[in-house]
């Protein structure tokens, strides 16, 4: 039977048990010593694909570690799982759906059947619709109610309808097309809409309402606020269609809102929100960078898809990163993973990967609903470049937790200023080096002696300057951020998450935990506004409701 119908006890597999024994043998493994003993270690534990270079030599592994981790991937049936996903089998078991975000980046001429229907013509039909719309807006042919061309596009969406598109449009800002500015409105916080709308003119603004169901609370509330603002600024109901379009599978609701049917871009239930930037949800990306660059983004992701399907596991970038995550999370006690981009334009990648990883693998039951046998997804956190060095890197270096990290850095800057980029790149490398090397007590004492301190002061200060080292990290290098390379990078992390879900036996493509808060939120709201008099289910929530009602004005 297919792997997803027979969730396994991964801890009972021979490779898992061998890894437990190997972990004990690696207790005193020193990366410092490993590099000193093997001049080829960097070559052995690095690889290139799809415009990305991965150095994973600064990890608590040797060749036996990698071999055993690869055996684990083989024993959980990873190759069959990969084939199942790409061929359209139902691997989202709890919702009875295939998982086919990869279909969105497949080239013209490919065939892929879902329920006996080839979906690829429809995929490329929507891509052509995107191309046509973007062309009309960029050429000034799509005009607002005053017949002026559109200058600003506001994407109204949250979660996957926001994080992925925001990441890509910001990361590819050097590729931005002139004449159209893209903005994002996600949170149901009036201050966000206030600050955004203060810099817009209704007559030249186009809103994209991105919601698969067209009933996402935050998105609908913001869409209604945008509509009210548009009318207050001089727009009319009759001309509303010029200023609002939608990406949704609920055409009726979008039409009822006032959006013309021809301006509604479809979504499919086999594309999850956090995997949807490749679909019409990526419309703001195409508007920001142009459809030619958007298609390059898709092509880059497709090359990673090919690598993922065909490369042997020991040379497969997403598989190796996934296995390293399992190694640290399940055998070394790591509970979080840091994403550290050394590039201003990539500053939002951590937010996207938080949703991608934590919403996918934050699960506590196997695909059949029984409890998991081991820990699953880690906390994903981090931030941009040198800023982190002056904030939380201290904990990475001298804290008590083992926190693996991914450093992401380009070789070439779009905006060279003197020798800034050389220093940025040097800082990235030196941070990973410092995590690995650390500083011994002897080195700390010698350093203090060189500064002229007496022995009594050295004895007091040296312990504080000792840095354990042996902290693992990966370094991902790109020559220069481009649509194609960014597509490959994001797709790589998508596949990494999937691989880990297969190993743990969980479903990476549902998110039932998100739904509970939505359901409870309705009752809390009704109690806040006084339309429901019954007390909340617990005293804490009711107390906080009472506190709000006693002090809120308006």
Curated annotation (Swiss-Prot):
Keywords: Cytoplasm, Gluconeogenesis, Glycolysis, Isomerase. Gene3D superfamilies: 1.10.1390.10, Glucose-6-phosphate isomerase like protein, domain 1 (3.40.50.10490). It catalyses: alpha-D-glucose 6-phosphate = beta-D-fructose 6-phosphate. One of its GO terms (molecular function) is glucose-6-phosphate isomerase activity. It is found in: Cytoplasm. Pathway: Carbohydrate biosynthesis; gluconeogenesis; Carbohydrate degradation; glycolysis; D-glyceraldehyde 3-phosphate and glycerone phosphate from D-glucose: step 2/4. It is an enzyme of class 5 (isomerase). One of its GO terms (biological process) is glucose 6-phosphate metabolic process. The active site is at residues 359, 390, 518. One of its GO terms (cellular component) is cytosol. Its main location: cytoplasm. SUPFAM superfamilies: SIS domain. InterPro entries: G6P_Isomerase, G6P_Isomerase_C, Phosphoglucose_isomerase_CS, SIS_dom_sf, SIS_PGI_1, SIS_PGI_2. Its EC number is 5.3.1.9. Catalyzes the reversible isomerization of glucose-6-phosphate to fructose-6-phosphate. Belongs to the GPI family. This is Glucose-6-phosphate isomerase. The gene is pgi.
């Amino acid at each position: 039977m297919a792997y997803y119908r027979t969730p396994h006890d991964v801890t009972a597999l021979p490779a898992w048990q061998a890894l437990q024994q190997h972990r004990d043998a690696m207790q005193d493994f020193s990366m410092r010593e490993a590099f000193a003993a093997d001049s080829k270690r960097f070559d052995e534990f690095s690889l290139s694909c799809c415009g990305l270079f991965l150095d994973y030599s600064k990890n608590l592994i040797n060749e036996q570690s990698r071999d055993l981790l690869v055996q684990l991937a083989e024993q959980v049936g990873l190759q069959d799982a990969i084939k199942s996903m790409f061929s359209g089998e139902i691997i989202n078991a709890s919702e009875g759906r295939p998982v086919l975000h990869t279909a969105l980046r497949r080239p013209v001429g490919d065939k892929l059947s879902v329920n006996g229907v080839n979906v690829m013509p429809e995929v490329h039909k929507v891509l052509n619709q995107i191309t046509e719309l973007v062309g009309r807006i960029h050429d000034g042919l799509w005009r607002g109610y005053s017949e002026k061309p559109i200058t600003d596009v506001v994407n109204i969406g949250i979660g996957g309808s926001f994080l992925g598109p925001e990441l890509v449009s910001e990361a590819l800002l050097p590729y931005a097309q002139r004449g159209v500015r893209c903005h994002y409105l996600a949170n149901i916080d009036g201050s966000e809409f206030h600050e955004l709308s203060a810099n817009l003119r209704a007559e030249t603004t186009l809103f994209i309402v991105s919601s698969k169901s067209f009933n996402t609370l935050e998105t609908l509330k913001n869409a209604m606020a945008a509509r009210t603002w548009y009318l207050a600024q001089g727009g009319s109901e009759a001309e509303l269609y010029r200023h609002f379009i939608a990406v949704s599978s609920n055409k009726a609701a979008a039409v009822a809102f006032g959006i013309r049917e021809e301006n509604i871009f479809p979504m499919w239930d086999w594309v999850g929100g956090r995997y949807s930037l490749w679909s019409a949800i990526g419309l703001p990306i195409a508007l920001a960078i142009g459809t030619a660059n958007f298609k390059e983004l898709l092509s880059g992701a497709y090359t990673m898809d090919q690598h993922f399907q065909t490369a042997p596991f020991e040379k497969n970038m997403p598989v190796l990163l996934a296995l390293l995550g399992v190694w640290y999370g399940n055998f070394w006690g790591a509970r979080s993973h840091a994403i550290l981009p050394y590039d201003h334009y990539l500053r939002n990648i951590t937010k996207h990967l938080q949703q991608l990883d934590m919403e996918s693998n934050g699960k506590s039951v196997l695909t059949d609903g029984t409890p998991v046998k081991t820990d699953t997804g880690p906390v994903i956190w981090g931030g941009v470049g040198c800023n982190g060095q002056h904030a939380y890197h201290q904990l990475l270096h001298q804290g008590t937790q083992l926190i693996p990290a991914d450093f992401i850095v380009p070789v070439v800057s779009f905006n060279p200023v003197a020798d800034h980029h050389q220093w940025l790149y040097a800082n990235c490398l030196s941070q990973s080096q410092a995590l690995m090397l650390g500083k011994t007590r002897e080195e700390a004492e010698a350093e203090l002696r060189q500064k002229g301190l007496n022995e009594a002061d050295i004895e007091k200060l040296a312990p504080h300057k000792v840095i354990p080292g042996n902290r693992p990290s990966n370094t991902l290098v790109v020559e220069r951020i481009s649509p194609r390379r960014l597509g490959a990078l994001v797709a790589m992390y998508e596949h990494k998450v999937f691989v880990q879900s297969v190993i743990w036996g969980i479903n990476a493509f549902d998110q039932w935990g998100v739904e509970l808060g939505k359901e409870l939120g309705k009752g809390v709201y009704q109690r806040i506004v006084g339309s429901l008099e019954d007390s909340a289910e617990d005293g804490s929530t009711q107390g906080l409701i009472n506190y709000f009602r006693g002090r809120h004005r308006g």
